């Protein structure tokens, strides 16, 4: 299998206007445009600053605990009876997910820009926890917007955020999920542009956020290249990751986009099934439109109104997807599939029993796709799955589903 070529066309985006093909851009209120342009300038300067890079590397290593292990899942591999399965163990990071990679990068940028107040949106609560964590570490005020539906199903994370000193503001609008939390955070930002830094948690939002979040998450894929090279002496044959907004996936995928031999698979949340309309699969069941400052694939009705997304996993419950994913779907470089709630739950249980690892329900969607594909593949096929987070936060949800299914059987 060939190593990366010098041709990095697919990794060069976005263009100066923040576009990946026809996706992305900057669709923001006039009051925000100067701030967005300033943020883009500051980020470009930080990327070239050796002191910034050195400080980021220090915190990734000594605070986050990187590199995260690339673990050969021997029992999952035996169970599937085909491809050799490796897990990229992002759940072992400080705070229990990949989210901290991006938060450390952005908090250093916020400090560089002299901002004293941090705001963020959160769905599953993991980005909220990671944001509250870095705000505490750097002594900055922190406000987290979270939908009431998500607050109900992620109470442990709400408590963790408060413990870390953040103010958690419940959002009752809409379905009380991630989309609504992001709407409120954007409103706050417009009102408090001078003092406030909006720490977006995924590869969405107006430019430069999709590229910036991707760059901070790309440490996942860079480490995976080196680790698999050390363990197997070659590149993976396929990569698999779950997708909500898509930051954990983009972090794994981006360093491999120009390696044509590497098959890349993104897994959306099919909820109750795409055909039911109760899902969060923007690429498999959506159309292009504009939301939260960028053009991408969205779940919307014939009038262009955003349709409520559904997933058992709070972190995948978003009616859009990062614009770079939309572009990669459009050009056919990445395959985007989907997995139902039930399939994800089954994979969650298998991973617990076979590997002694409790994955997040988000990551369980990626595992479910692996369970479909791995048995059909040869034993020398190397498959890397991004285990994006741990499942502690999902105990209530899983218990509820186990109790419900017991009742249905009786």
Curated annotation (Swiss-Prot):
* N6-(pyridoxal phosphate)lysine modification, residue list: 99
Identify the keywords attached in UniProt to this record, alphabetized.
Amino-acid biosynthesis, Aromatic amino acid biosynthesis, Lyase, Pyridoxal phosphate, Tryptophan biosynthesis
Q: Which Pfam families match?
A: PALP
Q: What cofactor does this chain's UniProt record say it requires?
A: pyridoxal 5'-phosphate
Pathway field = Amino-acid biosynthesis; L-tryptophan biosynthesis; L-tryptophan from chorismate: step 5/5
Q: Which reaction does it catalyse?
A: (1S,2R)-1-C-(indol-3-yl)glycerol 3-phosphate + L-serine = D-glyceraldehyde 3-phosphate + L-tryptophan + H2O
Q: What is its EC number?
A: 4.2.1.20
What is the top EC class of this enzyme, as a single word? lyase
GO molecular function terms listed in the Swiss-Prot or TrEMBL record: tryptophan synthase activity
Listed GO CC annotations: cytoplasm
Q: How does it assemble?
A: Tetramer of two alpha and two beta chains.
Q: Check the record and name the HAMAP family matching this protein.
A: Trp_synth_beta
Its annotated function is as follows:
The beta subunit is responsible for the synthesis of L-tryptophan from indole and L-serine.
Which family does the similarity line name? Belongs to the TrpB family.
What the entry lists under PANTHER family is as follows: TRYPTOPHAN SYNTHASE, TRYPTOPHAN SYNTHASE-RELATED
- Protein name, entry field: Tryptophan synthase beta chain
């Amino acid at each position: 299998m060939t190593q990366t070529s010098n041709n990095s066309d697919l990794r060069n985006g976005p263009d100066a206007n923040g576009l990946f093909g026809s996706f992305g851009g900057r669709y923001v209120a006039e009051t925000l445009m100067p701030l967005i342009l300033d943020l883009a300038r500051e980020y470009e300067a930080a990327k070239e600053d050796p002191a910034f890079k050195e400080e980021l590397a220090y915190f990734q290593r000594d605070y986050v605990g990187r590199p995260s292990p690339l673990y050969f899942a021997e029992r999952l591999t035996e169970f599937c009876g085909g491809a050799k399965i490796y897990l990229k163990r992002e759940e072992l990071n400080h705070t229990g997910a990949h989210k901290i990679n991006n938060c450390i990068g952005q908090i250093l940028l916020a400090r560089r820009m002299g901002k004293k107040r941090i705001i963020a949106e959160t769905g599953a609560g993991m980005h909220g926890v990671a944001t509250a964590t870095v705000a505490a570490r750097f002594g900055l005020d922190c406000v987290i917007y979270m939908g009431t539906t998500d607050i109900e199903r992620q109470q442990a994370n709400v408590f963790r955020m408060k413990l870390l000193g953040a103010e958690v503001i419940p959002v009752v609008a809409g379905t009380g999920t991630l989309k609504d939390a992001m709407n409120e955070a954007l409103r706050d930002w417009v009102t408090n542009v001078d003092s406030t830094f909006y720490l977006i948690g995924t590869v969405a939002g107006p430019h430069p956020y999709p590229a910036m979040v991707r760059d901070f998450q790309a440490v996942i894929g860079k480490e995976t290249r080196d680790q698999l090279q050390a363990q197997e002496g070659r590149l993976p044959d396929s990569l698999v990751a779950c997708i909500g907004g898509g930051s954990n996936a983009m972090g794994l995928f981006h360093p491999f986009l120009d390696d044509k031999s590497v098959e890349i698979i993104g897994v959306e949340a099919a909820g109750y099934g795409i055909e039911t309309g109760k899902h969060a699969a923007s690429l498999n069941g959506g159309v292009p439109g504009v939301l939260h400052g960028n053009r991408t694939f969205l779940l919307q009705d014939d009038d262009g109104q955003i349709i409520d997304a559904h997933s058992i996993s709070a972190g995948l419950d978003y009616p859009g997807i990062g614009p770079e994913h939309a572009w990669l779907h459009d050009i056919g470089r990445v395959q985007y599939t989907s997995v139902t709630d039930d399939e994800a739950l089954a994979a969650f249980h298998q991973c617990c029993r076979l590997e002694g690892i409790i994955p997040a329900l988000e990551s369980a969607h990626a595992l479910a796709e692996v369970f479909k594909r791995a048995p059909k593949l040869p034993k020398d096929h190397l498959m890397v799955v991004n285990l994006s987070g741990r499942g502690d936060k999902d105990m209530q949800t899983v218990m509820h589903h186990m109790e419900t299914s017991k009742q249905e059987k009786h």
